């Protein structure tokens, strides 16, 4: 499945990566597979919509991960 990374999550990983899909994989497993600390992900989308990282994913899903955004 395709995982799109944004901002600081791209460092040493690139804009998009492929993660091997298996039955029952969820967003938390994807984040862990990429070596990302769960607290480093602020926005989690599946196919462009807000999603729960505990929900199982489909092989054709596109996951997007965003870090916390700051500024003022």
Language-model regions, residue ranges each:
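Ubiquitin-like/PB1-type beta-grasp interaction modules and other compact soluble beta-rich domains
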Residues: 1-71
